[in-house]
């Protein structure tokens, strides 16, 4: 449809990605949602009218096919939300696993670079475009056991700033949203499916929700075209740093 604003979201099957799809649809975007877990995307498509496509950001062929499908259907992309990410393990470097570091860096760094490179022609085809990268407070902090993950999110910060320099002079805004503690599937994945250990992360805390971060994304992308929200840090009030959290302050009500 002519004039339709197209928002492309990676990692859209759950958490911040799914919440962003819902909120961006309500804000008037047509959402193209990509993820590996296509069964979950089906429900999202029915809920918000999104176009859903399989996507594995670590697979070059998958990324190329995803972008080609968006190009064939829409001809451009107004917004790219690089949300797909992971973090496996919380081990000190001395005990770290190669496979944990590999999947984290392949997804959070190489995957983000690959998707962005592949979508730049479609973003440049829009009158005004926007790239939103999901970073983390781990992109400017470190903590024991977090070497692989914090390295990946420091890289996201560097990539975001580099893109802003490289795209200067073009009508493409570049934003990083850096959340603190958000209650999603992240901790379950980090602890390899140990739900009890994941629950302990949020014990006694009112963490951020996926909708909180989606709300920030929608706010950033709906500013006037000449306004670029460079870098937004969002934490729950109980969290002063990655490793400094006050417990039992009460709920968010």
What are these regions (language model features)?
Residues 121, 165-168:
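Alpha-helical segment proximal to the catalytic Tyr-Lys
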